[in-house]
Curated annotation (Swiss-Prot):
Residue numbers of Phosphotyrosine PTMs: 233
Organism: Mus musculus
Entry's Gene Ontology BP terms: chloride transport; positive regulation of osteoblast differentiation; regulation of mitochondrial membrane potential
EC number(s) per entry: 1.8.-.-, 1.8.5.1
Subunit relationships: Monomer. Homodimer (in vitro). Interacts with TRAPPC2. Dimerization requires a conformation change that leads to the exposure of a large hydrophobic surface. In vivo, this may lead to membrane insertion. Interacts with AKAP9.
Name of this protein: Chloride intracellular channel protein 1
Single GO cellular component term: chloride channel complex
Residue numbers bearing the Phosphoserine modification: 121, 156, 211
Chain spans, region Required for insertion into the membrane: 2-90
Length: 241
């Protein structure tokens, strides 16, 4: 007889109305992990301005997101992800870890470059900061268009050409995608709204990657509304003057 699954509840940051999902890439990351695991779970949005007594008791520190697994409370996004990967494992649940270590680090500096770009108010620095963001996106594009070791046929003398895989580590979403995609989505929304910047069409690997991701419910349905992201960055994004 199959072991009964413990109750799983993810507590995430609420949006501006105190109810819908707010802007938080860490919350979305864990939301995606649970969805991909195929486990039954609940998501509770927490209004950071009006925390309920239940939330205060469960997590006095108030750090979001946090996970209730049975009666255990888990905090820290990285540790929660490790815990879920260890507890919700094969044969009942899929393994989500990437096979290639490079998949876990590719594109991770994009968010830092984006933050520097969007927080800058000095027009004289704008071009260089934009170039820094473009360079980071180019590194990701190179990784996405380069064949993974398992895509290379060592017996063939022909050049393998451009990878056509859907995601960072292959044709299935992994933990690496759960980490990167929520941040890439924020970059797209915020840069377009506050800088009129869009990811260049020349970065075909990145565009293919995002297109494949938005076609997956686990990503598209866990994204906060664009308005929530724009609102979160309203005070962060500095006007050039």
């Amino acid at each position: 007889m199959a072991e009964e699954q413990p109750q799983v509840e993810l507590f995430v940051k609420a949006g501006s109305d105190g109810a819908k999902i707010g802007n938080c890439p860490f919350s979305q990351r864990l939301f995606m992990v649970l969805w991909l695991k195929g486990v039954t779970f609940n998501v509770t949005t927490v209004d950071t301005k009006r925390r309920t007594e239940t939330v205060q008791k469960l997590c006095p520190g108030g750090q979001l997101p946090f996970l209730l697994y049975g009666t255990e409370v888990h905090t820290d996004t990285n540790k929660i992800e490790e815990f879920l990967e260890a507890m919700l494992c094969p044969p009942r649940y899929p393994k989500l870890a990437a096979l290639n270590p490079e998949s876990n680090t590719s594109g991770l500096d994009i968010f830092a470059k984006f933050s520097a770009y969007i927080k800058n108010s000095n027009p004289a620095l704008n071009d260089n900061l934009e170039k820094g963001l473009l360079k980071a996106l180019k590194v990701l594009d190179n990784y996405l268009t380069s064949p993974l070791p398992e895509e290379v046929d060592e017996t063939s003398a022909e050049d393998e050409g451009i990878s056509q895989r859907k995601f960072l580590d292959g044709n299935e979403l992994t933990l690496a995608d759960c980490n990167l995609l929520p941040k890439l989505h924020i970059v797209q929304v915020v840069c377009k709204k506050y800088r009129g910047f869009t990811i260049p069409e020349a970065f075909r690997g990145v565009h293919r990657y995002l297109s494949n991701a938005y076609a997956r419910e686990e990503f598209a349905s866990t994204c906060p509304d664009d308005e929530e992201i724009e609102l979160a960055y309203e005070q962060v994004a500095r006007a050039l003057k």
